[in-house]
Amino acid sequence: MSKKAPAKEGKKLPRAATWYEIDMEKGVFRFKNKLCPKCGSVMAFHREPVPRWHCGKCGFTQFQR
């Protein structure tokens, strides 16, 4: 019989909670990452080999200066 894994200590936030910045004073939350200007999907930031924002859906890339 398989045994259950031991319970993890401390409560982890859901993964989606790490995608937003929450300002409790103003009661506002906003998305941390950029949205693609071409298709509206979420863009990922890559540091190597050159810092850039890249959309995995449509392939749009915006290089940092």
UniProtKB/Swiss-Prot annotation:
Transmembrane segments: none annotated. GO terms for cellular component: ribonucleoprotein complex; ribosome. The keyword Ribosomal protein applies. Keywords: Metal-binding, Ribonucleoprotein, Ribosomal protein, Zinc, Zinc-finger. Its cofactor is Zn(2+). Zn(2+) binds at residues 36, 39, 55, 58. Binds 1 zinc ion per subunit. InterPro entries: Ribosomal_eS31, Ribosomal_eS31_arc, Ribosomal_zn-bd. One of its GO terms (molecular function) is zinc ion binding. Part of the 30S ribosomal subunit. Belongs to the eukaryotic ribosomal protein eS31 family. This is Small ribosomal subunit protein eS31. It comes from Pyrobaculum calidifontis (strain DSM 21063 / JCM 11548 / VA1).
